[in-house]
Structures are given as C-alpha cells and as structure tokens.
UniProtKB/Swiss-Prot annotation:
Protein name: Small ribosomal subunit biogenesis GTPase RsgA
Gene: rsgA
UniProt: Zn(2+) binding residues: C291, C296, H298, C304
Residues noted as binding GTP in the record, renumbered to the chain: T157, K158, A159, D160, G210, S211, S212, G213, A214, G215, K216, S217, T218
SUPFAM superfamilies attached to this UniProt entry: P-loop containing nucleoside triphosphate hydrolases
Length: 363
C-alpha cells in the first residue's frame, strides 16, 4: 500500500470514479474525518477478513473495523468486494458510501441483506445454453439488479454447444425490448467474448453472477487471456457445476476494466427494495397500470390489460406468472424490512446503534 498520498491515476485503473479527489459530498465528509487515511478497494472477501489494493499489481490483507466482527452487526454494512475503504496502515478505518450495488435477501428466517458486489457499472447475468438455461432465474437476477444503479447484461454461454441459441434469444425477446442487452457467446473463444467489450472499458467495473457451472470462471479466464480462475466440469445429468469459485474476488483485466467473479448462488431472495419496473418487468407494470381495477390479480378480472396481452400473444404467460410470484416476494420482504427499520428506530432512544439500509443511486 502507498504511504504518502493517493495516486489517483493508479486508483482509476482499479475503478476509482474520479480523476482526482472525491467529488461527492458524502465521500468528502468521510475523507475529512480521517485526514491521515488513504483509499483502497476491497478485492477479496473471505470469512476471515478482506484483501484490499490501491494498485492493480499489489494487495494486502486488511484488519477490518472491530464492529464488523460482532456477530449481530448487519452484514450489508460490512465491506463487500468492490467497496472503497479508507486505510491507516493495514487497518480499515472507514467504509466509503456505495455508489451502486447488487444485493439479495440472505438465507434464513430472519431478515438480513447481503451485498454481492459494490460500486459496479455492469452486472453480467451468466446462464448456460444447456440444462442450466432458465428464463425465470434470469428474471429473478434482473429483479435484484434493478434499482441498484448498475446496467444488467444477460450473457448466454455455451453457444457453441447448442443449435438452439436463436430459440433461447427468442424466449428472452421481451427483455431485449426493454433495452436489456442479450449476448450469446462461447466463453472459451476470445473472438466470441469480444461481444462484451462495450461494457469493459477502461476504469469500469463489472460483476459476473449466475449459477454454478454457468461458465463464469471460464469467461473470466478468457477475458484475462490466462488460466487464473480454476474451472471444473459440470455434471452431465443436470449441467450443474461444482462451485469452482469459492469467494468473491475483483480482478483487473487487460482492457483496463475490473471484473468481479462470484460463487454460484442457489438462493436469490428479494430485499424488499426492488422495483419491478426497473427489474425487467417494465412492460408488465405498464400494462397492469391500465387494468380496470387497481388491485387486479391478473387472473380472471374483467378489464385486465395483462390477461388481454397474454391472449393476444404479446406476453409470455410463464413470465407473467413469475412476475406475480416475485411481486408477492418483494411485498413480503418489504414488510420485513419495514419492521426491521422500525425496530432500529426504537433502538435509537436506548442507545443502541441503528442499522441503516443503504440505497445506492444510479451512476
């Protein structure tokens, strides 16, 4: 790590968002509170701690804030891969505000949020064109991305292993109509993967998300031009992978961009902050607003614009069914979130530290 002053041009090479010192008031305030600290980016996240870097070539194990080590400390308020922190020596002394993020509801009965990646420009939703292909899961990922400030791009891998790539793209054409880019690639072929270049320019940060075995690590290796990430095969009976990536890591690419690889995620629960219109269902939401009844369930009500669109083959009925399911899940999570916020507000008077819920803005 540097021990003099921030080298902003070098920091830009790992995603620093400005040519010099921070320009946002919230960031300036944190810097002012820690005048001796230097910025660094979280490039690895492990159960035992973090690895941070202030150049593409050098990194170090960092000592986290003491409160982050408390079992009941909100997980989404701890640093995640992609976060910017302030360092004094090897110690993290502050977490800088997130500009964007992708989050999910953590597994378990109690309400928690988990940050998958922070300060990202693009989310590559990776899905294999084999038994892994699942439009409903893609829609769930799009919901989690929506409202977080990053651009979603659906990447269909293993395009070389199927004759049905065009059929898969047709299934997802309703998404493309909402300006959600779709790309079918052979993850092992640099010429094919070049289709992702528009989102991997100098200083930009992208994250790969998708199920285990979808080809995320293979895609990472091709973009790097080297076998940096370990890859395994997939089970022939169900095309499921063996969790090649075991932790989240930020990797500088030759293009000047940064790429975050993530382990496959089995559970994708909403946080309650999602916006269905921004999460891949803007067309369904627009039609729902035209229904005769405000509380239309889109099942058999008269004057239902959504059912009319389905009957006219303008909407995929399975996609609408998934929309209805996700709408219920978001509403349920929103109730749990409201309860948690109310509990935190009551805790203010007792001297307990409230757990804030960050809502990143669009970049």
């Amino acid at each position: 790590m540097s021990d003099i002053s921030p080298d902003y041009p070098t920091l830009q090479s790992i995603g620093w968002p400005w040519p010099g010192p921070p320009e946002e008031a919230a960031w300036k305030a944190v810097f002012a509170a820690h005048p001796q600290a230097l910025p660094a980016r979280v490039v690895e996240q492990h159960r035992t701690g973090y690895v941070v870097a202030d150049t593409p070539e050098a990194s170090l194990k960092a000592e986290s804030l003491p409160e982050w080590q408390r079992p009941r400390f909100p997980s989404h308020e701890r640093a995640a891969v992609g976060d910017w922190v302030l360092m004094e020596g090897k110690r993290i002394v502050a977490l800088l505000p997130r500009r964007t993020s992708i989050k999910r509801g953590a597994a378990g009965a109690h309400y928690h949020q988990q940050v998958i990646a922070a300060n990202i420009d693009t989310v590559f939703i990776v899905c294999g064109l084999d038994a892994d292909f699942n439009p409903r899961r893609i829609e769930r990922y799009l919901l989690l991305v929506g409202g977080g400030g990053a651009q979603p791009v659906v990447v269909l891998t293993k395009a070389d292993q199927t004759e049905h790539a065009e059929d898969a793209l047709a299934v997802l054409e309703e998404l493309e109509a909402q300006n959600i880019p779709l790309r079918a690639v052979n993850a092992k072929d640099p010429a094919s993967v070049a289709a992702l270049r528009p989102w991997l320019g100098d200083g930009r940060t992208a994250v790969l998300v998708g199920s285990s075995g979808a080809g995320k690590s293979t895609l990472t290796n091709t973009l790097l031009g080297t076998e940096k990430m370990k890859t395994n095969g997939v089970r022939e009976n169900d095309s499921r992978g063996r969790h090649t990536t075991t932790h989240r890591a930020l990797i500088p690419l030759p293009s000047g961009a940064c790429l975050i690889d993530t382990p496959g995620m089995r559970e994708l629960k909403p946080t309650g902050e999602e916006d269905l219109a921004e999460g891949g269902f803007s067309d369904v939401e627009a039609l729902a607003a035209q229904c005769r009844f405000n509380d239309c369930a889109h099942i058999a009500e008269p004057g239902c614009a959504v059912r009319a669109a389905i009957e006219a083959d303008l909407l995929d009925p399975e996609r609408v069914a998934n929309y209805m399911k996700l709408r219920v899940e978001v509403a349920s999570a929103a109730e749990k979130l409201a309860t948690r916020v109310a509990q935190n507000n009551r805790g203010k008077g007792s001297g307990k530290r409230p757990a804030s819920i960050d809502r990143p803005g669009r970049r």
